[in-house]
């Protein structure tokens, strides 16, 4: 199960530089707008110290990390919803991702170009955020307006149950968008959420803000005025802010583990910005990790929190879900505490879970099935 997050922002805020650091893909990061036209998609491993510890304990032939995907979507400019810049192509790319990572420039650099009509040295995080959000809102409003009249007609004339339910949802969304607010600010019940999901709206997607600061300021970002502004706005959306230096992260991505540790220590950091971003993205999408562990392989698997054991088994293979019998389960903490599966069992901590078991982050599972 791959997390899919689209990296968005105005031209030259550091999107492609960040993407390069995440994926080590070397995507073009030229200093001019629209250096990225087709989205770059990178699948990256999720760093997890638990996977490393399990490998140390079990000593398998192979270790496999779970993965997630980032898409570097070319810079959006004011008027994108009307086709400005490379407009609707970018919005269509954003529509396909599960979450939005919104990169905001929070550093001064006279050598970095800005979008047309903005001086290179002028930094205004709030204006940048507003520009992006407004384009997404306008794109959603266009989508809603296209559906509104047609669904209303069917709902009123044919009394179709599904159309009536959808029209009710459209009536909730339309005025909110018209007032310049994102659809994610609306509370929907469970049935309404199913309808909203089918609308593929941009402003219902969860958002994570990335404040891209200079290398000199990344170790102590709390006093940066730009970062304070971004955090204040993000709080109004219950969104998280991750502070990174994309340029520093790109340098770090080229180093081996030993040099990486020394580089981070020299900068006054205890972890990379990419690791922080990964954790934040996981939290944003409500994801967790369970493990399968044996002599041949130790592997991490991504799951949506709240799923039951059969659905977790289905992540490995559909046959596991269809023929699910039970899941022999222990927690990561118990395995580390007792040192082996045998010791966990002797301590009475090895469990057999059935079809109603809600999988927990850090579970180590062996699925029993019959097809």
Map each language-model feature to its residues.
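Conserved G1/Walker A P-loop phosphate-binding module
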Residues: 1-115, 126, 151
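Generic signal for short, ordered secondary-structure residues
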Residues: 16, 33, 69, 73, ...
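Amphipathic alpha-helical transducer elements in NTP-driven molecular machines
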Residues: 34, 48-51, 61-70, 84-98, ...
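Short, surface-exposed linear patches
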Residues: 64-67, 90-94, 101, 125-136, ...
């Amino acid at each position: 199960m791959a997390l899919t997050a689209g990296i968005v922002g105005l031209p030259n805020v550091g999107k492609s530089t960040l993407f390069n650091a995440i994926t080590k893909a070397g995507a073009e990061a030229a200093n001019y707008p629209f250096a990225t036209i087709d989205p770059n998609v990178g699948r990256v491993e999720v760093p997890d110290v638990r996977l490393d510890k399990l490998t140390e304990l079990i000593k398998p032939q192979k270790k496999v990390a779970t993965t997630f995907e980032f898409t570097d979507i070319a810079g959006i400019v004011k008027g994108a919803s009307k086709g400005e810049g490379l407009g609707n192509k970018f919005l269509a790319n954003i529509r396909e991702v599960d979450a939005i990572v919104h990169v905001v420039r929070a550093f001064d650099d006279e050598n970095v170009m800005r979008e047309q009509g903005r001086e290179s040295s002028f930094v205004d995080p709030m204006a940048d955020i507003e520009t992006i959000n407004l384009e997404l809102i306008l794109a959603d409003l266009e989508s809603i307006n296209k559906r509104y009249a047609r669904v209303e007609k069917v709902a009123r004339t044919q009394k179709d149950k599904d159309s009536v339910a959808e029209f009710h949802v459209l009536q909730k969304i339309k005025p909110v968008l018209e007032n310049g607010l994102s659809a994610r600010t609306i509370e929907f019940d469970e049935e309404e959420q199913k309808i909203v999901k089918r609308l593929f709206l941009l402003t219902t997607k969860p958002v994570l803000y990335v404040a891209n600061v200079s290398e000199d300021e990344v170790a102590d970002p709390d006093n940066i005025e730009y970062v304070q502004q971004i955090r204040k706005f993000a709080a109004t959306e219950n969104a998280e802010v991750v502070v990174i230096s994309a340029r520093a992260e790109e340098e770090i991505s080229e180093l081996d583990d030993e040099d990486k540790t020394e580089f981070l220590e020299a900068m006054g950091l205890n972890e990379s910005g990419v690791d922080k971003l990964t954790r934040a993205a996981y939290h944003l999408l409500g994801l967790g990790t369970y493990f399968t562990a044996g002599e041949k392989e130790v592997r991490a698997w991504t799951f949506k929190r709240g799923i039951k054991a059969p659905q977790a088994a289905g992540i490995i293979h559909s046959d596991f879900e269809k023929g699910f019998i039970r899941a022999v389960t222990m927690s990561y903490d118990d395995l580390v505490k007792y040192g082996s599966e045998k010791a966990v069992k002797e301590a009475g901590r090895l469990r057999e879970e059935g079809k109603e078991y809600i999988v927990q982050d850090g579970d180590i599972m062996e699925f029993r099935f019959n097809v």
